[in-house]
UniProtKB/Swiss-Prot annotation:
Catalytic activity reported: 3-methyl-2-oxobutanoate + (6R)-5,10-methylene-5,6,7,8-tetrahydrofolate + H2O = 2-dehydropantoate + (6S)-5,6,7,8-tetrahydrofolate
Organism: Halobacterium salinarum (strain ATCC 700922 / JCM 11081 / NRC-1)
Localization of this protein: Cytoplasm
UniProt binding sites for 3-methyl-2-oxobutanoate: 46-47, 85, 115
Known EC number: 2.1.2.11
Names of the cofactor(s): Mg(2+)
NCBIfam families the record matches: panB, PRK00311.1
Cofactor binding description: Binds 1 Mg(2+) ion per subunit.
Protein name: 3-methyl-2-oxobutanoate hydroxymethyltransferase
A biological process from GO: pantothenate biosynthetic process
Residue positions of the active site: 184 (proton acceptor)
Major location (coarse): cytoplasm
């Protein structure tokens, strides 16, 4: 059974460990399937905004929406480490509010850890949260909450200066107590160098094969996204299966073949009702 500490040890290059697996989930049925499959960590991502709630970006996602999804996932998860994503502006502006919002995910919704889209502004907050017993997963590279500042969903760390700044931030967050680091949309060689330079595990998404683990959005994996990023891979086609099932249902109702006798109950002790 994975724990925050066992995940942290996966970044120790002196130990032979399997790559860390992480997927997103936002509801109990999905979390149950992911957990039963043996995935190490479940991220209740703010990607729920795009994947489930109909938002164009992750920016509108609220603390209440993440909290509700986190509780549902945690109730359905027996083994995986549940990580709650901290949504846009739920942290960083005020330390007291940041601690309260992060603590809520553990205290009320039974998460095991929180994830912060990270930068220079989250180093001291990471130290504060971990000192209070709230495990923190850092996140560098493409940080979708900064899409307006970045001008789009572009690869990060593509020049020497930005790659070295990313490495410095990775080291700073490790020193502040982060137990793992997500690297998103980062050149594979940069991600490999950062992975070699720090002891906590790196979890890649669009960051090549040499990180300590991988994470993807569940809707991309199962084929339920209208658009997937180029670094993702579709392992199923749930959209096609769902569309076929719904078509069959409509046909069955319209043709009168559903519900059939086996789907109905007759009360033998009830006479005709007038």
């Amino acid at each position: 059974m994975p724990t925050v500490n066992s995940v942290r040890r996966a970044g120790n290059t002196d130990e032979e460990t399997d790559p860390v697996t992480m997927l997103t989930a936002y509801d109990a049925p999905t979390a149950s399937v992911v957990d039963d499959a043996g995935v190490d960590m479940i991220l209740v991502g703010d990607s729920v905004g795009n994947a489930k709630l109909g938002y164009d970006t992750t920016l509108p996602v609220s603390v209440d929406e993440i909290a509700s999804a986190t509780g549902a996932v945690a109730r359905a998860t027996a083994d995986a480490v549940v990580v709650a994503d901290m949504p846009f502006l739920s942290f960083g502006a005020d330390e007291t509010e940041s601690v309260r919002n992060a603590g809520r995910m553990l205290k009320e919704e039974d998460a095991d850890a929180v994830k912060l889209e990270s930068g220079p502004h989250t180093v001291s907050l990471t130290e504060t949260l971990t000192s209070l017993g709230i495990p923190v997963m850092a996140h560098l590279g493409l940080t979708p909450q900064h899409v307006n500042q970045l001008g789009g969903y572009f690869r990060q760390g593509t020049d020497q200066d930005s790659a070295e700044r990313m490495l410095d931030l990775a080291r700073d967050h490790e020193a502040a107590g982060a137990f793992a680091l997500v690297l998103e949309h980062v050149p594979a060689n940069v991600a490999a160098d950062i992975t070699d330079a720090i002891d906590i595990p790196t979890i890649g998404i669009g960051a090549g094969p040499d990180t300590d683990g991988q994470v993807l959005v569940i809707s991309d994996v199962i084929g339920m996204s209208e658009r997937s990023p180029p670094f993702s891979k579709q392992f199923g086609d749930v959209n096609r299966e769902m569309a076929a099932a719904v078509d069959d249902y409509v046909d069955a109702v319209e043709s009168g073949s559903f519900p059939a006798a086996e789907h109905s109950h007759v009360a033998d002790d009830v006479d005709d009702v007038y």
